[in-house]
Regions:
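An N-terminal assembly and electron-transfer interface module characteristic of large anaerobic redox
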Residues: 1-405
Length: 405
């Protein structure tokens, strides 16, 4: 498994982690549980609904169906608050031919049992996300009528470092004009069942296969959007949403303009020295397009590397960094060693972030998000070892001049 691209099982676990009253049961070896849990646990140790039946050597020989059935019985006994169990099967049971569907069909209990077939060899983390999303279809219930100005959100995962705060910030922007019916990064089984009631589905990178199925079966249209980083990113999103739902967001757009003017007034003396400096981005596809637009269009930096982590490896990232010499890295904690090697700042904004946590209501979207990202970039530059002729020399000089004045 390549650390950046990971595997289908990791993607399935990520996609299902936001369903508060559902349990993820991995039918696989212990390493799958340890790896996927380690990335999630760092950010949310208080919300872990993930277990494993742990297939051993003897189960490879004799079959793992017995341990799966026992695990399902234990899940029913221990996780009484969970109305559903998603059995995510990994490489080993699929290679030895375990009849997972047969076990689920013959296991009695009150919990809904759904199989997500996600062996690592079958695809990368992106394919696992889409497979897990499609597994939600049996839970959906047809709606007699649509609820006007309501949306579902696909693509943002519960373990994204700012997922909760970004969702709350988005709700503030939408106000009373648009209701979020179901956001898969923070929802219940009831919310999922009611998804066909929504007027529109929003896909941030992921979720298009599920959205297409919902459009065909339930008549819910969808739009693909870039994640609304920064002022311009949020403005673009609101215009896109307003056009689809026939809603006027002119007041919200004006508020964003005012916030942008205030932010520029406070940060322009520093940001002018970042113009056209090379930056490298490596995130999942839910965030990549929005980040690329933010750095290029709002900050004026030169994006020399913009890679979807599902198609990339750390070795290739190192080769690209050696070639393009970025002065800033933006992505996950996996980029830390590379940032240390080149002595450049790392802005952690994507999964997995296991060496920097967020306990505040900070967000990465809209004007508040732009301010936080700018703050992290400038502070990261200032914290680098002083070099009189370094790429950040102009930034240091301008800050000294501002402080002197």
């Amino acid at each position: 498994m390549k650390p950046l691209s990971s595997c289908a099982l990791f993607g399935a676990v990520r996609a299902l982690g936001g369903i508060k009253d559902a349990l993820i049961l991995q039918h696989s070896v212990v390493g799958c549980q340890w790896g996927s849990l380690a990335f999630r646990y760092a950010g949310k140790p208080y919300d872990v609904r993930q277990v494993s039946d742990v297939i051993y050597d003897e189960d490879v020989v004799n079959g793992g169906e017995k341990v799966l059935r026992k695990a399902l019985q234990e899940a029913e006994r221990i996780f009484t608050h969970c109305g559903a169990v998603f059995v995510v099967s990994g490489c080993v049971p699929n290679m030895i031919g375990d009849d997972v569907d047969g076990i689920l069909a013959t296991t009695e209990g009150s919990q809904k049992l759904l199989h997500v077939k996600a062996p690592g060899y079958a695809g990368n983390i992106d394919s696992g996300v889409e497979t897990a999303y499609l597994a939600l279809l049996p839970l959906l219930r047809a709606a007699e009528k649509k609820e006007a100005a309501t949306i579902n959100i696909f693509g943002i995962m519960n373990d994204d470092p700012y997922a909760d705060n970004d969702l709350e910030e988005l709700k503030k922007f939408l106000g009373s004009k648009v209701k979020i019916n179901c956001a898969l990064q923070d929802c219940s089984l009831r919310d999922i069942a009611a998804m066909p009631q929504a007027e529109l589905n929003i896909c941030f990178g992921y979720g298009e296969p599920l959205a297409k199925q919902m459009q065909e079966k339930f008549g819910v249209p969808y739009i693909k959007c870039a994640y609304p980083y920064g002022v311009a990113g949020m403005q673009k999103f609101l215009r896109q949403l307003g056009e689809a739902l026939k809603i006027d967001f002119s007041d919200e757009l004006a508020d964003l303009e005012a916030a942008a003017e205030k932010l520029v007034y406070r940060s322009a003396d520093y940001l002018v020295n970042l113009y056209q400096l090379p930056v490298a981005l490596a995130t999942d596809k839910a965030h990549l397009a929005g980040l690329q637009s933010f750095f290029a269009e709002e900050l004026g930096m030169r994006v020399v590397i913009a890679e979807d982590t599902a198609e990339f490896s750390l070795d290739k990232m190192a080769e690209a960094a050696a070639k393009h010499k970025p002065v800033l890295l933006c992505g996950s904690s996996f980029l830390k060693n590379l940032a240390d090697t080149y002595q450049v700042p790392l802005v952690r904004c994507a999964y997995p972030a296991f060496d920097q946590l967020c306990f505040t209501d900070n967000t990465l979207i809209g004007a508040r998000g732009a301010a936080l990202l700018i703050e992290q970039i400038v502070n990261g530059a200032l914290q680098q070892q002083y070099k009189t002729d370094g790429r950040y020399a102009g930034l240091r000089e301008s800050i000294c001049e501002v402080n002197h004045e």
